[in-house]
Amino acid sequence: MITPAFDISQDSDFLTIIIKVPYARASEIDIYIEGDDFKFYAKPYFLRLALPGRIVEDGRQKATYNADDGIITVSVPKETPGQHFEGLDLLTSLLAPRGSKSAKPLVEEIGSSDNVVEEEEDEFDWQIEQTPFVEPTEEALQSQCTYGFGNLRSGVFRRLQEELNDVIDLRDPDVTPASERTRRRLAAEKAKFDPDHYLADLFEEEPVQHLLKYQPWWVAEIHAGCSLSAESQERRVSFSDKQKEQLRKFTNKSHLLDKKTQQQAYLGLIDLLLAYCYEVRVTEGDQNVESAWNIRKLSSTLSWFENFTCVKDILVSFGRRVLCYPLYRNFQLVEKAIADTVSLLKLGKAAVLKCLLEIHAIFQENDPAYILNDLYITDYCIWIQKVKSKKVASLSDCVQSLSISKSDLGFELGELEEAARLVQEEETQGQLASSTCLVRPLATVASESSDTDSSTSDTDDSSSETEDSTSEESTSEEEADPTDSELQKAIVPGQNSRVQSSLEKAGEEKNKLPAAGKAETTVTEQMKHLAEKMNSAVILSEAPVGPPGVQDKSPEKKAGECTAQSAQSTTGTPMTREFLEVTPRLNPLLIVPLSDEDDELAEH
């Protein structure tokens, strides 16, 4: 038989059941109504529902069939008008069989009879009683190496350890007791914590601030209305067709948990919801390929098979893992995820079930993580449908009453942040000081420019004085020996025109001089280099002083004698030569490199 897809809604007087039977015949439909039991049969479909309230067949019931869509709508009156049926959206729990059974199950739940009056339970205490530590024996250690929902599984990883290394952080879970798991987890978190990554997310606030402004769908539902009654909670939570299909596929079963294991199941649920709320916030509700990794990595229950004993330990463990593993490692995100979890629990077990179904779908699509559905998520999806709403509300109040600080996480975050701020202040002050040194006042630049102009004018004056003295000496020498003057003109032809052109070029270069802010050392080196070229090029030789009778020789003979005398000077014969006196202070206006044409004239 096939269990058909169905949906249930209610108003104050009637219960409406919509059943999808596309391949059924309208002539073969049977409906059975009695008390809290509803049965539907249309070959090949069969549906049996155990309702949370009583219905009655009094003639007001009716059924309609849409042959085009293959949908049957059954409207059944409530036995007590105005009664609210709780948990109609928890489809798996509605499929539970009741009444007499033809065969007894292998494991029977004691006290499941309808005639047994449910005892009123005391207020749930979320703090498990502490017991003194006793060194366990080897047999006791083997019995403690259990995991999964309610610690009901063991031996799963004995043959699959290599394949499941990427799923969980715990190695050899089948031989590692709970106390050793906690110790290894704390050591791994301490080794994984990266101060640089944490400080980068702390001071780069823009990405984190954007994530902090996001509101998950359940927070928006809480803000949309003030009422948190069971009826209001069910109206706010709706399941998709895919989620309803998944609920119908779950096998309905009862979990036999003692008080301690039941409390650990509730605490593990908080751990799962914290990891899920963080994932929804950082992805802004848009799941990606990293979603499965984020959820299982942030949950110590999934990654280390941790069994918590109090809510505070869960919050501390979650905060430590947020600062060690994901992309965004900020303490404000930890606080936001805790607040989101409180809001989710306030919305009721239907909202919790919806989130668990989303986790189940994420793991189902991730190849190595599907094993976590078998160990935890599937059982949580079935179990949460049967828990009492007041326990979920009590769990929400417990989480809301607690808070954690950075000092609780054990990473010395306060000292780390203070040291980072001091370093940041020092760097800021150093940058301000360097910028002040680089930006010189405008008045200083102007004064340096005026000093440069004055030094240039002084150099021009000294150069002109030197030229005057040189011209006077040459004039006196020409008067004393006019032949020597003619010889100098023959040796260095066109010297006067070259000096004149040099002065003109120097005047043009003066107009092209760079601003006063240029480096003075570079200009000085260039001046020295050009001066050496000028000294090597501009050398004026005078004729040697001889007897008086030699002065009436022709210029050609004088040139020959000069050549002979220069040859004798190379052999050691003393000769008197005079050079043009160069001013000891270099004048940049007279330093002009010789052209190739001038070099040829100087050689001839």
UniProtKB/Swiss-Prot annotation:
Residues 458-484 have a biased composition (Acidic residues). Residues 494-503, 563-574 have a biased composition (Polar residues). Residues 447-457 have a biased composition (Low complexity). Keywords: Cytoplasm, Nucleus. PROSITE patterns: CS (PS51203). Disulfide bonds: none annotated. It is found in: Cytoplasm, Cytosol; Nucleus, Nucleoplasm. One of its GO terms (cellular component) is nucleoplasm. It holds the Pfam family SHQ1. Residues 1-89 form the CS domain. InterPro entries: CS_dom, HSP20-like_chaperone, Shq1, SHQ1-like_CS, Shq1_C. One of its GO terms (biological process) is box H/ACA snoRNP assembly. Belongs to the SHQ1 family. Required for the quantitative accumulation of H/ACA ribonucleoproteins (RNPs). This is Protein SHQ1 homolog.
